[in-house]
Amino acid sequence: MSFMNFEPKPLADTDIFKPIKIGNTELKHRVVMPALTRMRALHPGNVPNPDWAVEYYRQRSQYPGTMIITEGAFPSAQSGGYDNAPGVWSEEQLAQWRKIFKAIHDNKSFVWVQLWVLGRQAFADNLARDGLRYDSASDEVYMGEDEKERAIRSNNPQHGITKDEIKQYIRDYVDAAKKCIDAGADGVEIHSANGYLLNQFLDPISNKRTDEYGGSIENRARFVLEVVDAVVDAVGAERTSIRFSPYGVFGTMSGGSDPVLVAQFAYVLAELEKRAKAGKRLAYVDLVEPRVTSPFQPEFEGWYKGGTNEFVYSVWKGNVLRVGNYALDPDAAITDSKNPNTLIGYGRAFIANPDLVERLEKGLPLNQYDRPSFYKMSAEGYIDYPTYEEAVAKGYKK
């Protein structure tokens, strides 16, 4: 292994290392570990890995006052469809999450759980095997031929969820949020980005409904806002957040190709700001930058340059977490962190650098990540990345 080939800059004297209040917590700095899918949970059961997960989160929360957002976790079995991603609905799952939350808190850092519902990005055959539906906003609006073939082969065609099923998903979000808070989490992040179920309702490419959940900008936003309102009522606005990817194309979303989507996200943010002015301000809004339109592309590939996320500041006046290719572009991180109430998320860099916050603070070189091990069921590429001192001792070079 080696260090990444770029010139880091010390960020200690920038806005990134100023404290900020998020919900009920006081962060020492604005470097955030965003949700990172790692596929190490046990199957069956979707249980966080009892051998490795606590150590993984302990390592990355070692700098006191750091905000950690967990990998996406399924609120219910129906929300899932990936065998090795964790859930938060069973006691067996929650028993492991409690250990993870304790490890993070023992480091004097903070933890938010991302609540993740796949919709049509699930594997239809996995769901069929478990007696579960293959859900989305609309019937049989598949991402592509492979997904269609998989669904038909497993006799589990894509199903546009009914109003009663929408209500059940909302109950699932609420139940999961309460369980996470009761287990010791500081808050929850509702995943409404990257082409997953809530994003499928927001985007007209996947939402072909003709009822009150489809058609207009207001209708397409209804499900998302109902989830937010229900979770806020259950655990408090200060413990609730949400993620969007306005320009993302992952999951065959429209991204920048459909100009109505900027208006769509501006509308949702405006509705959240209305609620904030009425005393229910979310802890933060998490935005994936157009610098990353798909999580499977290397740095600076797939960069959509026809728009920016700057519009958020005209609408939403609360905290903003911005995520996307900041590790190799410290100047962009410095510039964007000058915006009001802004935090910066580092994804792949946090995977490969357990002491990332200290490295960013001091301008130290970063470990090169190993992409093939991102989703590999092993400790390798998960809990064996060295700290800077360990890397130097091993002879790492650029």
Swiss-Prot record:
What EC class does the entry list?
Answer: oxidoreductase
Q: Which UniProt keywords apply?
A: Flavoprotein, FMN, NAD, NADP, Oxidoreductase
**Reaction catalysed?**
butanoate + NAD(+) = (2E)-2-butenoate + NADH + H(+)
Q: Where does FMN bind?
A: T37, H191, R243, R348
Name its co-factor(s).
FMN
Q: Which residues form the active site?
A: Y196
Single GO term (MF): 2-enoate reductase activity
List ligand-binding residues for substrate.
H191, N194, Y375
**Pfam family name, one:** Oxidored_FMN
- Write down the EC number: 1.3.1.31
What Gene3D superfamilies has UniProt attached to this entry? Aldolase class I (3.20.20.70)
Q: Which PANTHER family match?
A: NADH OXIDOREDUCTASE-RELATED (PTHR22893), NADPH DEHYDROGENASE 2-RELATED (PTHR22893:SF91)
Function of the molecule: Enoate reductase with broad substrate specificity for different alpha,beta-unsaturated carbonyl compounds. Prefers NADPH over NADH as cofactor.
Family, similarity comment: Belongs to the NADH:flavin oxidoreductase/NADH oxidase family.
Quaternary state and partners of this protein?
A: Homodimer or heterodimer.
Report what the protein is called.
Enoate reductase 1
Q: Give the classification, highest ranks.
A: Eukaryota, Fungi, Dikarya, Ascomycota, Saccharomycotina
